[in-house]
Amino acid sequence: MPVMKFRVCRQGREARWVVTLGAAVYGAYLDQEQALLDAVDAARDAIQRGREAQVWLWDHSVSSRIF
């Protein structure tokens, strides 16, 4: 099974924080911390179901693996 890569980034005209998984977009968070918390929770749930998961933070042109 492929790795589930949750990406936390800003999106839209208002630059709201969102979590993406492939082409799916989840949430419109007011801050980065809330988006990261939800992404890490989702990744942990995936790992508990036997999947491999990662969380990446994309801010401007820099990406960092968080989990």
Language model features with spans:
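Short, mixed-charge low-complexity intrinsically disordered segments
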Residues: 47-67
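A short, exposed loop/beta-hairpin motif centered on an aromatic-Gly-Thr core
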Residues: 21-36
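Short acidic, gly/pro-rich beta-turn/loop elements at beta-sheet edges
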Residues: 18, 29, 65-67
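Short aromatic-glycine-(Arg/Gly/Cys) micro-motifs in beta-strand/loop hairpins
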Residues: 2-25
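Charged, amphipathic alpha-helical segments
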Residues: 1-3, 33-41
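Short, solvent-exposed helix-to-loop capping segments enriched in aromatics
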Residues: 43-45
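Low-complexity, intrinsically disordered/propeptide-like segments
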Residues: 24, 39-40, 60
